[in-house]
Amino acid sequence: MGSDGLQWVSRSLEHRPMTSLWRDIRHEVAAWLGSLKLAIGLFLAIAAASIAGTVIPQGESTDFYRQNYPDSGAVVWGFVTWRFIISLGLDEVYRSWWFVALLLLLATSLTICTFRRQIPMLKAAQNWKFYTEPRQLSKYALRTAIPARGTGPLAEQLRAGRYKVYQRDDLIYATKGTIGRVGPIVVHVSLLLIMAGAMIGAFGGYQTQRMTLAGDSFDIQQVEQSRLSLARPPDWTVRVNKFWIDYRPDGSVDQFHSDLSVVSPAGKELERKTISVNDPLIYDGVTMYQASWAVGAFKLRLNDSPVLTIPMQPIEAPNGQEAWGQAIPFDKDGRVALQMVTRGLQGSLMLLPFNPRTGETVREAATPARVGKPVSVLGQRLVIEELVGQTGIQIKADPGIPVVYAGFALLMVGLAMSYLSHSQVWAIYRDGQLHVAGRTNRAQIGFERELVRMVAAVQTPRPRTSDALSAAQE
């Protein structure tokens, strides 16, 4: 650039005030933030993040990811390692700073688009005016001029078509479906509500699962929370009064139930309900679902000993079915142990003596046992007093759910409103001619047919040549 060019730039900057420069910058930034391309890109990025949050287990320990997503050997998808997951925050996608930033950026984009585009379009639709000269209608592609006896018949046709008609002298303005201009605004507001509800749930809620024996209690305060959670769990506890399973005739599980009580710190029962699958207990914003079950323990009496409670552990059955078992010492020398196995809470077990040092069975066949019925094993009298069920309760608190539901309900309303066409019609009567023009924002063909039908209904027939000559002779 020569000296003349530099001098021109210098003079331009000197004569351009800083307020104007900042105004232009703000305008460009606002235009970019409110652009459709940015909004679509943000939607796609949020969708991709949500897929990652669905595929990758959330809220697990570092050891879990180190074990399931190793950084050597069989790497998942070739690049998804535990280091990759932890460094990008994919273990808590919906609470990560970048996911929150995407939501805030999308919310900003929708807000700017609403105020810069949708609201001005709504105001423009409401700020109508009469056209007074036929030439003013020439800017509309859909226009015509017909012989008529005035504007009255067309006004009647428009009212019959559910248009709101305004008349002044020989001028008409008619409109229908203005509420359709409100639809996009309602959609934007609903999306903002959904995102707000998602963020409230992410930072104000918690979710976990507890395995509890019948008769025991668990404290909501002990629920493991995310490191970014702002929620304060309640101080009441939950007592499992009873747990039982309904079985089908073939022995398969039909349904399982937990009788739960919500207990205050003072020991007062605040709420009680028997929950089952798809029938949770909801109290104080916390939902408790019946999620799983297990055989937690069994109670036995050996000869004249007191009742012993022995915990059960899940084991691998030969046929792949669920089973629980435990081995207990059965003699003083430690040469015999008794393996106890059950497949559920139906009340039956199999007892198998074996040598814990060699793993060899003491005798060939296992001894079946039933709850409450004595059985003899190697000369010892043994009674299984009870099989104690263990219930799996999923605990979830999400204060953002009502906001999300409200957002989705509003979204349905907004989408329905957006499908309504906003149609406008102008008419001017001059010198026996009715000049008509119209426009719509959607359903163009249907609007054209409607307008053609109304115009044809009010058009007066042109006089035939013979009638015109007769009139001239008279």
Swiss-Prot record:
Family, similarity comment: Belongs to the Ccs1/CcsB family.
Assembly description: May interact with CcsA.
Membrane topology: Multi-pass membrane protein
Functional description taken from the UniProt entry: Required during biogenesis of c-type cytochromes (cytochrome c6 and cytochrome f) at the step of heme attachment.
Gene Ontology CC: one annotated term: plasma membrane
Residue ranges crossing the lipid bilayer per the database entry: 36-56, 96-116, 182-202
Transmembrane among keywords: yes
GO biological process: cytochrome complex assembly
Main location: membrane
Subcellular location: Cell inner membrane
Protein name: Cytochrome c biogenesis protein CcsB
Pfam families the UniProt entry points to: ResB (PF05140)
UniProt keyword annotations, A-Z: Cell inner membrane, Cell membrane, Cytochrome c-type biogenesis, Membrane, Transmembrane, Transmembrane helix
Keyword Transit peptide belongs to the record: no
